[in-house]
A protein has these predicted regions:
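Conserved nucleotide-sugar phosphate-binding/catalytic loop shared by glycosyltransferases and other
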Residues: 3-10, 30-79, 227, 309-311
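A short, well-ordered alpha-helix in the C-terminal region of glycosyltransferases
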Residues: 330-344
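C-terminal alpha-helical cap of glycosyltransferases
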Residues: 343-360
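Short hydrophobic beta-strand element within catalytic cores of glycosyltransferases
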Residues: 262, 278-289
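Active-site-proximal region of nucleotide-activated glycan assembly enzymes
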Residues: 53, 112-174
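Donor-nucleotide binding loops and adjacent catalytic segments primarily
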Residues: 41, 46, 50, 173-178, ...
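Glycosyltransferases and closely related glycan-assembly transferases
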Residues: 85-96, 104-119, 132-137
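Acidic donor-binding loop of glycosyltransferase active sites
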Residues: 93-95, 247, 255-270, 277-278
Length: 360
């Protein structure tokens, strides 16, 4: 069996793609799996780290304003589709999976034009433009939220949930506290700005460090690369405040946390559901169709999360966080409700659908 998985750009696309590949390889150890990403993006290093080969396309997204790069966009797309077509003809995959990100569209266009079975994995509650355009061409669309028939043909939809790393919910709290050097007698707040960081969360957290100390709250703070030097300097001045550029052991970070502050990317939301963590979501305003707000509202509408807008975060985020940290009953209520939304078998179900296409 040969499989191409295309897409990337952020952890929210890369980690589900790797989870799908791992499940395919678990069932079919002989499978040949090739990733296709965008040159210069995160997947070009993260995918090889996970043990898979990746090939890069020279493709970027459209800018929101008129730029010279936008004028070249059609040329780049044409070249990327042509290169993707050559890759497909050389590799001869039995199926192609698109997980979103710049490289996903050229590969799916090339695959569907050659009648190769194709599957889209849409992570968000609001479908992106590219996936909506590709929907008529692909064979199957795996989604994470109810109501997606307003974007896609209903006969192609399968409600699966999002693939999440299987170990993410297996962290042991005692081991986690020891790993991060945290005090078991104190509450722990985890702040995660996504794999690329988040300026609003970082600035609000930096401004609240004294308040957290005074309240006896411990902090695990994933800053992203750009803010890390400043955050480390600030956090090093106080006990119990830990700034990290990137948290490799998210299973232990979730296990240690009593409350989580996070962006509302699809992967983050799925992980919070699976780990059952009381959470405050601050959707990024810098995403297509404001899809993070829609992801967050899917939880908030069921009483499973708190939402603070990016605009209001500087003034309100840590007032709300400290209230929640001081209210164990509310933490437990949010935890129970968010866990009800988890789909722990998402990866298995997606690979089931993929293998059905291969066997046809």
């Amino acid at each position: 069996m040969k499989l191409i998985i295309s897409g990337g750009g952020t952890g929210g696309h890369i980690f589900p793609a790797v989870a799908i590949a791992n499940e395919v390889r678990r069932r079919h150890p002989e499978a040949e799996i090739l990733f296709v990403g965008a040159n210069g993006r995160m997947e070009m290093t993260r995918v090889p780290d996970a043990g898979y080969k990746i090939v890069g396309l020279d493709i970027t997204g459209l800018q929101r304003r008129l730029t010279p790069q936008n004028l070249m966009f059609p040329v780049r797309v044409f070249r990327a589709v042509r290169k993707a077509g050559k890759l497909i003809e050389e590799f001869r995959p039995d199926a192609v999976v698109g997980v979103g990100g710049y490289a996903s569209a050229p590969v799916l266009l090339a695959a569907t034009s050659r009648a190769i079975p194709s599957l889209i994995q849409e992570q968000n509650s609001y479908a992106g433009l590219v996936n909506k355009l590709l929907a008529k061409r692909v064979n199957r669309i795996c989604v994470a939220y109810d109501g997606m028939e307003k974007f896609f043909p209903a006969d192609k939809l399968v409600l699966t949930g999002n693939p999440v790393r299987s170990e993410i919910s297996l962290g042991d709290r005692s081991a986690a506290l020891h790993f991060f050097g945290l005090d078991p007698s104190k509450q722990t707040l985890l702040v995660v700005g996504g794999s690329l960081g988040a300026r609003t969360l970082n600035q609000a957290t930096a401004a609240a460090l004294t308040r957290l100390q005074e309240a006896g709250i411990q902090l695990l703070w994933q800053t992203g690369k750009l803010y890390f030097p400043e955050a480390r300097q600030q956090a090093d001045q106080a006990a119990g405040l830990h700034a990290l550029e990137f948290i490799q052991r998210m299973d232990l970070a979730y296990a240690a946390a009593d409350v989580v502050i996070s962006r509302a990317g699809a992967l983050s939301v799925s992980e919070l559901c699976l780990t059952g963590k009381a959470c405050i979501l601050v959707p990024s305003p810098n995403v297509a169709e404001d899809h993070q707000t829609k992801n967050a509202l899917a939880l908030v509408s069921k009483g499973a999360a708190v939402l603070i807008t990016d605009e209001h975060a500087p003034a309100r985020l840590y007032d709300e966080a400290l209230r929640l940290l001081s209210d164990p009953e509310r933490q437990q209520q949010l935890s129970l409700r968010v866990r009800e939304l988890a789909r722990p078998d998402a990866t298995v179900t997606i690979v089931d659908e993929l293998l059905k296409l291969v066997r046809k």
